[in-house]
């Protein structure tokens, strides 16, 4: 990326299981690249640079211009900030550190998205893969909810699990896999519905 963009790269980081030290063989390589600006030709240059990298098939992540990142939804920036391990640069030089209000927004908007997708999937798609993806997404909502209650962000699933009880703990356990479609859909739906009511803005 340095050869493709020179001094335009304001930040490079890594997210996901590799950032948390929980990666398995074949886990995605979630890279964050923030440039001073990002136009469509820059996307093409990113793609060309990525083609030469080893394990290209695992590469994914987030690419943005600095102004777009600063204008991003604060609730989404909460998880983005806390889930990103810096490799080059500091996110704090680009965005303010997200706080408790941003965490509340993350819980509410995340729960709304899960609620809608879960009900749609149960009624129409009946897709176990989509349910698994929603359960994985719930982990970000759970981290934000835990932050609201403790003031601490727990990246590790094991550390997070130690602090959760009740429906929160049940959803996290379902996100680890092997859940029955009907039962897991019910638990996830009821959990998301409760959070929407609790965190209504």
What are these regions (language model features)?
Residues 7-15:
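Short, glycine- and small/hydrophobic-rich beta-strand elements in well-ordered beta-sheets
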Residues 30:
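N-terminal loops that bind phosphate or other acidic moieties
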Residues 1-3, 7, 19-26, 36-201:
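Catalytic core of pol beta-like nucleotidyltransferases
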């Amino acid at each position: 990326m340095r050869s493709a963009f020179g001094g335009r790269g304001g930040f490079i980081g890594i997210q996901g299981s590799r950032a948390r030290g929980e990666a398995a063989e074949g886990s995605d390589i979630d890279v964050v690249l923030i440039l001073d600006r990002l136009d469509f030709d820059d996307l093409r240059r990113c793609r060309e640079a990525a083609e030469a990298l080893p394990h290209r098939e695992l590469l994914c992540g987030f690419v943005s211009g600095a102004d777009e990142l600063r204008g991003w939804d604060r609730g989404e920036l909460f998880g983005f900030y806390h889930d990103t391990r810096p490799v080059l640069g500091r996110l704090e030089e680009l965005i303010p550190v997200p706080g408790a209000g941003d965490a509340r927004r993350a819980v509410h908007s995340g729960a709304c998205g899960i609620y809608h997708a879960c009900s749609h999937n149960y009624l129409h798609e009946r897709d176990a893969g989509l349910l698994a993806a929603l359960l994985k997404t719930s982990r970000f909502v759970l981290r934000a909810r835990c932050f609201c209650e403790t003031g601490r962000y727990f990246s590790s699933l094991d550390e997070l699990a130690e602090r959760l009880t009740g429906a929160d703990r049940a959803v996290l356990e379902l996100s680890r896999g092997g859940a029955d479609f009907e039962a897991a859909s019910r638990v996830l739906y009821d959990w998301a519905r409760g959070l929407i009511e609790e965190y209504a803005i």
